[in-house]
Design a protein with these regions (language model features):
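His/Glu-based metal-binding/catalytic segments typifying zinc-dependent metallopeptidases
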Residues: 64-69, 76-81, 261-364, 372, ...
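M16/MPP (pitrilysin/insulinase) zinc-metallopeptidase core fold and M16-derived inactive scaffolds
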Residues: 50, 69, 74-142, 181, ...
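Short, Gly/Pro- and small/polar-rich lid/capping loops
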Residues: 33-59, 65, 290-293
Length: 537
């Protein structure tokens, strides 16, 4: 994620150039009649990285700041935790830790905490992801100390009462039931589950329902003791001078106890929080062989028949994914551009006609096949792996046709000749769209804050937006074709040494209008994909 800076300076620079050209067009006689005006040397505009600073406290907490002026400031705490680090004992705990944020602490009751949060007049939240727990607040400049204090309290000094645990477990149970009724929410989770086989990135982000009775205060405290450590913590400030940022971080996080880092034994991470939490997931994501996770619209699969589930929509959902590149890879820019180039969306757009009309999936799929309800590319990037592919919704009975259409669109990215091959015009358009999207996203203080904190957490530094835009702009058609061939051909080699085979998640709907409908087996799906030259056998 990036933020646009210097556009006003660029405008001034263009204006100066035009003025100079105008003065140069005057005749020599006119210039000789007037004394030349005094000129002032204008310093070049500051790079945003000139305003970025990173310090490390004695206990290992990293403090990052970006002193961009504005009426609002942001403060965030990013902890290297999340579902990818969970083992069997801690499975699903990240979901509950997320929900327990901003409850009672050793200094405030839950009512006092809520009142303090409301007094900020901004936005405060906790978000759990696969690789990070993110506590963030955007508020008025004058309220930054209070916001930092509240974040520190909920991170370092939560009470976690029995009543709070009971309430959040009940809420989590309701969330789980509701999300499983929404294919657009649960199927991306199942794509990760199928691709990474219940390890690291395949661990469920949503707490499994069967785990809820086993999670209590002791389990949550074990999770916090294992991962809430200073060396795994980044405190980021947006719109705050670095000296003030260091002072606030020292005041509220400087006393976090520095302990020995998690020890690694083979491919596992040892948790020292208790005997029950003896090991965590492997630190390297791996895709183990080709996999398919069929999701029938039935309460239980019966080999002799099916029972329709009325809670599910009457559409077939299909996800086709391949292992992508890590977020630190130089090829991430090409893969993000390919994702933008494919684009896509729904057959009905609330944004009005023409929304996304120049993307490949919109023009070649949604505009061509009336039985396709939705078709969109996706790209998930993580520290050591990723997933790239297409998701689609179509009418019942069109599964085979939908799979062929998706494979055709992906294969077209790898061709060097023919009408499906990548063209310079569409590549340029995709690069411009990607840069525009990235720059506009960072107009949000919260996005800017998360960008700073996560980059320091992942890269150890803030990558300048100018550097990212330059890398996007310098991409060629050959670069995109090469990356597409590597990813879609199963040639990506990451730390986990994946198989290169495709991952398919299918939620097939039985077509009641015909008796000849036959569901595809995994062998049929796999062979169909290989026939298009995708994946590695």
């Amino acid at each position: 994620m990036f933020r646009a800076h210097g556009s006003r300076s660029l405008g001034r620079g263009l204006a100066s150039s035009l003025a100079a050209a105008s003065r140069g067009s005057q005749t020599c006689t006119a210039r000789s009649q007037f004394r030349a005006l005094a000129s002032v040397s204008v310093p070049p505009p500051k790079e945003t990285t000139d305003l970025d600073q990173i310090s490390t406290l004695p206990n290992g907490v990293r403090v990052a700041s970006e002193a961009l002026p504005g009426s609002f400031s942001g403060v965030g705490v990013y902890i290297e935790a999340g579902s990818r680090f969970e083992n069997g004992y801690l499975s699903g705990v990240s979901h509950l830790v997320d929900r327990l944020a901003f409850k009672s602490t050793t200094k405030r009751s839950v009512e006092d905490m809520q009142e303090a949060v409301e007094s900020l007049g901004g936005n405060i939240q906790c978000v759990s992801s696969r690789e990070s727990m993110m506590y963030q607040a955007a508020t008025f400049n004058s309220a930054v100390p209070l916001a930092t204090e509240l974040l520190a309290e909920t991170i370092r000094h939560p009470r976690i009462t029995d009543e709070e645990m009971g309430e959040e477990l009940a809420t989590a149970q309701y969330e789980i039931e509701e999300i499983w009724k929404k294919p657009e929410l649960i199927i991306p989770e199942l794509v990760h589950l199928a691709a990474f086989k219940d390890n690291t990135l395949g661990n469920p982000l949503l707490c499994p329902a069967e785990r809820l009775p086993e999670i209590n205060k002791q389990v949550v405290r074990g999770y916090r003791e294992a991962f809430y450590r200073p060396e795994r913590t980044v405190v980021a400030f947006a719109g705050v001078p670095h000296q003030q940022a260091v002072e606030l971080a020292t005041e509220f996080f400087g006393e976090m106890e520095a302990r020995s880092p998690l020890s690694r034994s083979g491919s596992e991470t040892s948790l020292e929080s208790g005997s029950s939490a003896s090991s965590a997931s492997s630190s390297k994501s791996s895709l183990f062989g080709s996999s398919v996770l069929p999701l029938w619209n039935d309460p239980a699969l019966n080999p002799t028949g099916t029972v329709p589930n009325p809670m599910q929509p009457n559409l077939t959902s299909l996800h086709l994914a391949f292992e992508g590149v890590p977020i630190a890879s130089e090829d991430i820019y090409a893969l993000a551009t390919l994702n933008t180039l494919l684009g896509g969306g729904g057959s009905f757009s609330a944004g009005g006609p023409g929304k996304g009309m120049y993307s490949r999936l919109y023009t070649n799929v949604l505009n061509q096949y009336g039985w396709v309800e939705q078709c969109q590319a996706f790209n998930h990037s993580y520290t050591d792996s990723g997933l790239f592919g297409i998701q689609a919704l179509c009418l019942p009975g069109k599964t085979q046709a939908m799979l062929d259409v998706m494979c055709q669109q992906l294969r077209g990215l790898t061709l060097s000749t023919g009408f499906q091959a990548l063209g310079q015009q569409e590549v340029t358009r995709a690069k411009n769209q990607l840069r525009s999207s990235l720059l506009m996203n960072l107009e949000s203080r919260m996005v800017e804050l998360e960008d700073l904190g996560r980059q320091v957490q992942v890269h150890g530094r803030k990558i300048p937006v100018q550097e990212m835009c330059h890398k996007i702009e310098s991409l060629t058609v050959d670069d995109l074709r090469r990356v597409a061939s590597d990813v879609l051909g199963g040639g990506v080699v990451n730390a986990g040494k994946g198989s290169g085979s495709p991952t398919v998640v299918l939620q097939d709907v039985f077509d009641h209008t015909t008796t000849s409908t036959k569901r595809m087996t995994w062998e049929e799906i796999q062979e169909r994909i290989y026939r298009w030259g995708l994946g590695r056998r």
